[in-house]
Amino acid sequence: YDLVVVGGGPAGSSAAFAAAKNGIKVALIEKENNIAETVRTSGVTWIESIKEFGIPNDCYNPIKNFSFVSPNNQVTISDSVATAAVLDVRKTYQWLANEAEKIGVDIFVKTNINAVIKNEQNDIVGVSGIGVNGKIIFHAKVIIDATGFTSTISKAMGFVTQWKRFGAGAEYEAKVENVDSETWWLMVGQEYTPAGYAWIFPLGNNIVRIGVGVGKPESDIDPTQRL
């Protein structure tokens, strides 16, 4: 392959799709049973980026109003035209992967990459791991580590040892009545969460994502306690 992308989340699927559109031979590798089986993001992004990839309108909810809330104040900033959106994350990632596959990307699920392959000059020339039929090896000119927080490839390369600062979050997806589908809310302050923030992001059709994020190691609070 010209390019091997490890991780089928937003970065990995987007990279594979963009590369394949430019004629690059790509393998996209995901350790779970399916692309987007587990979602670890609330899916807020810019409409400009959505349009760049041609993501269908039914994959996102446009946002015009941004409300920032603290214990003593609230400010809302509004756009006349929506510039941000909340993605249907699973639907979007699966769409990206399907489109990538249509233009020649080889997708390998249930494949856990756990090592890098180096040549005599100590250059990275591939990765290896365990697939559905046992050990599997991929050789490539370029490797992209899109494994997120786990940083599987970066750790194997020695680029990352352990994250010293990171965020931990928890989120519910719920159906509520009379929600403003064009407004998201961001809450800060000890009343909501220490060393972090809370949020309410609407997906449309009276569905919202309600979540809390906490900075580590600044706080040892379990974010689920603040939901």
Task: Report the location of each language-model feature.
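Phosphate-coordination loops involved in phosphoryl transfer and adenosine-cofactor binding
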Residues: Y1-D2, K110
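A conserved beta-strand/loop capping segment in the N-terminal third of enzymes
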Residues: T45-A97, K110
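Glycine-rich FAD pyrophosphate-binding loop
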Residues: V4, G8, F17-R40
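Structural motif
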Residues: D2-L3, V142
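Generic structural signal for well-ordered, non-membrane alpha-helical segments
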Residues: T38, S42, W46, A85, ...
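N-terminal Rossmann-fold NAD(P) dinucleotide-binding loop
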Residues: G12-S13
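Predominantly flavin-linked oxidoreductase catalytic cores and closely associated redox partners
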Residues: N22, E99-L227
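Short, histidine-centered active-site or binding-site loop motifs used for metal coordination
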Residues: E30-N33, V81, V212-K216
